[in-house]
Amino acid sequence: MIAGMAHNTSPLPMTATSSHRWHEFLDNIASLLPAGTAAVVVDGPGEQPGIVADCLAETLRAAGRPCWRPAGTSPDAAAPAAGTVMLADGPAWRTARDWDVVIWLRAGHAGHGHHPGGEADAGIVIDLHDPAWPVIRRVAGPFASRGRWYISETRAFFSTRAATWDTKFGDDLPAYSAAIAQARIRPGGVVIDVGCGTGRALPALRQAVGSDGTVIAVDLTPEMLRHARVKGRAAHAALILADARHLPFASASADAIFAAGLITHMPDTQAGLRQLARITRPGGLLILFHPSGRAALAARHGRTLEPDEPLAAAQLQRSTAATGWHLTTYDDAECRFLAIATRQ
C-alpha cells in the first residue's frame, strides 16, 4: 500500500529512503492515537485521505490493534466496536459525527484550510506536498505529549530543506542584524540561539557580545548544523545538537536567548517558553524573530491569521506572562516579526 501511495500520487518511484520515511511516519501517527476504542477520520484534498487511511490501517493491524475501515461515502450512525479503531476518510465522514481524532492532509494547492473544516480543528496536521516524504507538522495539545513523533518528524521536515534554507530566505541577514542590535544584548554575555538552523544569526550575535562573550547555537536537525559549518558559521559559535524542549544547560546560565521561528514549531508553546526561562538569568532577554511579518508569512503559505496563534499579540502576552517573562517589545511589521521579553 505504501508503494501504491507513491504510484497514485507521484510519477516518481518509491525509494528505500522514502519507504522508510513512510513507515516511520505511520508508526508515529499510530503512537499518537488514543488507546482502546477510537474514532479517527482522515480528511484533505483528492484521493489522498483514503490512501493514507488504508496505509494507517495496515500499520495498526500489524501492531496488533483491531481496525475497521467503514466503506462507502454515505455515513450512518456507525460506531467502532469496543477496543477497535474506526478509521474513516473524506469530508462526508468528517461531518457525520464527533471524532476522537481528525487528521488533516496539506497537499497540492489546498493544503492550508481552503476546504470546509480544513485544519482548524484537526488534532494532527500532515504535510503531504511531497507524496514520497510525508511529515507530521502539527499535533494539537491533547495529543502532543503522546508518542515519539516530535524529534523524528522535525528532523524529517528540516533535513530535506537544509541545503536550500539560506536561498529560500534570500538576503535577509541585515534584518537579523537590525533585530539583534535593537535588543541590546549585553557585551561579554552568554547568548544562546535556540533553533539556530544554518546559523544565519550567528555573525550578528557574535558581534553583539564581542570576543569576550559566548555564543552557543542549538538545533535538533544534524543537517542544519552541518550546513552551518559548511558556511563557516561555526567560527562564531559552539554548535550543539539538542532538543529545545530539554536544553542541556544549567538554570540561569544565559544572558539572552535568540529564537528565529522556533515558537511556532514547538508542540507546547508554554512548555517551550518555560524551558527558555529556566536557562535565562533574571533580567535576561528573550528575542523572538522572523525575517517576515506574520501576515506576510501566512500569505506565503496560503492561510489566514488566527487570533489564537502562538505569536498573536494577545496570545504571546499571556503565554510569556505565564512562563516567567515580561513582554516589552512587540513589532509585527510586514518586513519582520520581533518580540522581546525580559526574564522576571
Explain the meaning of each model-derived region.
Residues 79-117:
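ATP-dependent NMP and nucleoside kinases share a basic, alpha-helical "lid"
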Residues 256-268:
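A short SAM/SAH-binding and catalytic strip from SAM-dependent methyltransferases
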Residues 146-187, 200, 204, 227, 287-310, 315, ...:
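Conserved class I S-adenosyl-L-methionine
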Residues 270-282:
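A short glycine-rich, Lys/Arg-flanked "PGG" loop and its adjoining helix->strand segment in the class I
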Residues 192, 198-246:
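Class I SAM-dependent methyltransferase SAM/SAH-binding core
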Residues 245-256:
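A short acidic, Gly/Pro-enriched loop at the edge of an enzyme's catalytic core
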